[in-house]
């Protein structure tokens, strides 16, 4: 079960959270991930609905105690780019990074991959190289508020000042395990009643 038993939470639908549960399967086994998923469902304040910002808005409105959301959406709301209402809501909540005494917080990623047999391999590699350039990484940090992937590019000040950087990230779980465990993740989430 969830570590904050008795707290009502809001979270997106099961499809959106498959990578999170897949990482739990990889690290803790399918049985433990199934129990965790049951704990999530039993603590849901409502049936999953809306995007990450809707989860944060629900906590700010007192509809739930905890929201599971990607932090870059909180920073986006704090920026005011999504309007005064969302900015005000974001100021009412605080980010919390779970699993700090173990492998660290699960991190979703934005990624690019080259398809085997791609007809324009050189251009595809050039695109990936560009995405990893300081120019592109600064775009990600300043416009989507994601964490940069390369040294020399700093996170957006909204992230640094409001979310902090002093947390342990799960850098040990191989991202490839997310794909490998997707079917099992959906299976345990569905069995738990996670819509």
Please identify what each model-predicted range represents.
Residues 12-13, 71-72, 143-144:
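Short secondary-structure boundary segments
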Residues 15, 31, 50-53, 68, ...:
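Soluble non-cytosolic domains of exported or imported proteins
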Residues 88-119:
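Flexible, solvent-exposed loop/hinge segments that line or gate ligand/substrate-binding clefts
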Residues 25-30, 42-45, 60, 64, ...:
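Sec-exported extracytoplasmic/periplasmic mature domains
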Residues 157-195:
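Extracellular/periplasmic bilobal clamshell ligand-binding domains
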Residues 110-170:
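Mature extracytoplasmic/periplasmic domains
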Residues 1-6, 10-11:
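Single conserved hydrophobic/aromatic residue that forms the stacking wall/gate
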Residues 16-19, 23-98:
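Ligand-binding pocket segment of bilobal, Venus flytrap-like solute-binding proteins
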């Amino acid at each position: 079960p969830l570590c904050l038993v008795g707290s009502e939470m809001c979270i997106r639908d099961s499809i959106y959270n498959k990578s999170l549960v897949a990482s739990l399967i990889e690290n803790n086994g399918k049985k433990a991930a199934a129990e965790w998923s049951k704990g999530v469902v039993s603590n849901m304040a409502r049936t999953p609905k809306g995007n990450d910002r809707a989860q944060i808005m629900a906590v700010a409105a007192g509809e739930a105690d905890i929201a599971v959301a990607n932090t870059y959406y909180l920073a986006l709301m704090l920026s005011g780019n999504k309007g005064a209402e969302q900015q005000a809501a974001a100021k009412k909540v605080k980010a919390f990074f779970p699993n700090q005494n173990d492998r660290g917080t699960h991190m979703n990623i934005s990624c690019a991959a080259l398809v085997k047999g791609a007809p324009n391999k050189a251009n595809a590699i050039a695109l990936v190289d560009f995405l990893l350039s300081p120019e592109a990484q600064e775009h990600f940090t300043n416009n989507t508020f994601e964490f940069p992937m390369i040294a020399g590019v700093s996170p957006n000040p909204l992230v640094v000042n409001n979310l902090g950087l002093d947390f342990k990230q799960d850098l040990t779980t191989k991202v490839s395990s997310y794909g490998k465990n997707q079917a099992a993740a959906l299976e345990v989430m569905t069995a738990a009643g996670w819509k």
